[in-house]
Curated annotation (Swiss-Prot):
InterPro entries the record matches: P-loop_NTPase, Thymidylate_kin-like_dom, Thymidylate_kin_CS, Thymidylate_kinase
Enzyme Commission (EC) number: 2.7.4.9
Gene Ontology MF terms in the entry: ATP binding; dTMP kinase activity
Catalysis: reaction(s): dTMP + ATP = dTDP + ADP
Ligand binding (ATP): 10-17
Enzyme kind, highest EC tier: transferase
Gene: tmk
Native source species: Lactococcus lactis subsp. cremoris (strain SK11)
Family note: Belongs to the thymidylate kinase family.
Functional description taken from the UniProt entry: Phosphorylation of dTMP to form dTDP in both de novo and salvage pathways of dTTP synthesis.
Alphabetical GO biological process terms: dTDP biosynthetic process; dTTP biosynthetic process; dUDP biosynthetic process
GO cellular component: cytosol
Keyword field: ATP-binding, Kinase, Nucleotide biosynthesis, Nucleotide-binding, Transferase
UniProt name for this protein: Thymidylate kinase
PROSITE patterns found in the cross-reference section: THYMIDYLATE_KINASE
Length: 211
């Protein structure tokens, strides 16, 4: 494969989805075609799995079921959308990927990093991003943002207790520390304009020949 895979990661409330929307007009100026996508989702069946995972009514979904639903959606998404684009030499930029499962299910749900790493490898055949942008934010600030900005569309994972969200952030920070060559940490507590500017600066420096 000669494409480029970029993932965006961060706790709920960090604003990475908004940042992706803001940077798209600029990164679509890259020499290669850019394919924006998201997890869970990206293709039809994976989007249906997304609705099951995030529906606040589905309280009977336990931690292991949740993890396996995420991995099933990931496999579908990778096979149908990500791999064909990467094989065609395109730039795939994905809102959440393998590290979300490690942070949320491995750390947040206490299922164990080794278990999640293995399932990620099984679902993706070992595919890893060329670059992962991690949007970091204090847990209390993130939860305030969720309640303020998404009060009318809070999902099942948003409703988790604050302690779970703290474990997710701590997990992310450990993941970032383990692979410093793959990750770039961005301060998501700044203004949206500054976060967008920092994100574009990182991308243009890392992939200078692509712009």
């Amino acid at each position: 494969m000669n494409g480029i895979l970029i993932s965006l990661e961060g706790p709920d409330g960090a604003g990475k989805t908004t940042v992706l929307q803001e940077i798209l007009p600029e990164i679509q100026k890259m020499k290669r075609e850019v394919v924006p996508t998201r997890e869970p989702g990206g293709v039809r069946v994976a989007e249906e799995i997304r609705q099951i995972i995030l529906d606040p009514k589905n309280t009977e979904i336990d931690s292991k079921t949740e993890l396996m639903l995420f991995e099933a959606a990931r496999r579908l998404h990778m096979q149908e959308k990500m791999l064909p684009a990467l094989r065609a030499g395109k730039v795939v930029i994905v809102d959440r990927f393998i590290d979300s499962s490690v942070a949320y299910q491995g750390y947040g749900r206490d299922l164990g990093v080794e278990v999640v790493d293995w399932l990620n490898y099984f679902a993706t055949d070992g595919l890893k991003p060329d670059l992962t942008l991690y949007f970091d934010i204090d847990t209390d600030v993130a939860l305030e943002r969720i309640m303020k900005n998404r009060a009318d569309e809070v999902n099942r994972l948003d409703l988790e207790r604050a302690e779970m969200h703290r474990k997710v952030r701590e997990g992310y920070l450990e993941i970032v520390a383990k692979e410093p060559e793959r990750f770039v940490k961005i301060d998501a507590s700044q203004s949206l304009e500054k976060v967008v500017a920092d994100t574009l600066e990182v991308l243009k420096k890392r992939f200078v020949s692509e712009f």
